[in-house]
């Protein structure tokens, strides 16, 4: 599903196809709450009010999330700092210890790319206010500003991030529970 399909310059057939996808999607139909999370390129931010207007007819609670945190990667776009540390430990036949977790959480905080998205997040916040929908800053549940760390692992020790900004299944479940408990 692409929010950009609701951009004023989008092709009409793209809008129709997205609307059809939604109308046939069992998860969408049966849900009470719709959470909108995206990488949010500028054209998608511009299309968002039209998309929200379309969603109003379904009478569902809508929650808008800020632009996704992304993290600098090394060597390849699919290798996170976590991957590199685990690979280093594996090569050296080392064991993963608590201090490695703490070190990686600090590295994740330093490598997050949030300043680049300030303008887009301000626009998203303003759209949420105007539309009277809840707005959540991902930074609030991904990172701990006071301790300058970002979660790298679930409480069960699974990686949260697949790459620069996508979550693993275990990571998505962990973050969803964390978000739910924050209310």
Where in the sequence are the language-model features?
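Extracellular glycan-modifying ectodomains
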Residues: 1-183
């Amino acid at each position: 599903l692409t929010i950009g399909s609701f951009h004023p310059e989008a092709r009409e057939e793209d809008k129709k196809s997205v609307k059809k996808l939604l109308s046939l999607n069992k998860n969408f139909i049966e849900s009470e709450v719709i959470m909108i999370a995206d990488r949010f390129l500028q054209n998608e931010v511009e299309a968002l009010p039209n998309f929200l207007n379309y969603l109003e007819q379904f009478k569902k609670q809508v929650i808008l999330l800020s632009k996704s945190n992304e993290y600098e990667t090394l060597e390849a776009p699919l290798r996170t700092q976590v991957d590199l540390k685990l690979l280093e430990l594996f090569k050296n036949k080392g064991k993963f210890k608590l201090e490695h977790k703490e070190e990686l959480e600090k590295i994740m905080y330093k490598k997050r790319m949030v300043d680049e998205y300030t303008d887009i997040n301000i626009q998203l916040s303003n759209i949420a206010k105007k539309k009277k929908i809840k707005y959540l800053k991902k930074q609030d549940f991904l990172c701990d500003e006071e301790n300058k760390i970002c979660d790298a692992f679930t409480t069960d020790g699974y990686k949260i991030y697949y790459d620069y900004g996508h979550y693993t299944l275990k990571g998505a479940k962990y973050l969803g529970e964390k978000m739910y408990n924050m209310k």
